[in-house]
């Protein structure tokens, strides 16, 4: 009987803690403003072909090599 009572109390505790820890939904207007505010910074940090040419790659193979494996030309 004590084991059943303990199990019931534990399940009740888990249920109440999950309800108390529930998050509230986000407001749509605030999310849109944040996304619009981040768009220019994303565009400014994205790499371009001009950046690769300025770095000196000019169509050469990359300096960094793959770790190898059974077939290094697989990808």
Swiss-Prot record:
GO cellular component, one term: apoplast
Keyword Signal found: yes
Record keywords, A-Z: Developmental protein, Differentiation, Glycoprotein, Hydroxylation, Secreted, Signal
Modified positions (Hydroxyproline) in chain numbering: 67, 70
Region annotated Disordered, chain positions: 40-75
Signal peptide positions (record): 1-22
Family recorded in the similarity comment: Belongs to the CLV3/ESR signal peptide family.
Name of the protein: CLAVATA3/ESR (CLE)-related protein 2
């Amino acid at each position: 009987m004590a084991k059943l009572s303990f199990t019931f109390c534990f399940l009740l505790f888990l249920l109440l803690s999950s309800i108390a820890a529930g998050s509230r939904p986000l407001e749509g207007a605030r999310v849109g403003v944040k996304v619009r505010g981040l768009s220019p910074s994303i565009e400014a940090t994205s790499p371009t072909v001009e950046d690769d040419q300025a770095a000196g790659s000019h169509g050469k193979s990359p300096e960094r090599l793959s770790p190898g494996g059974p077939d290094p030309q697989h990808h």
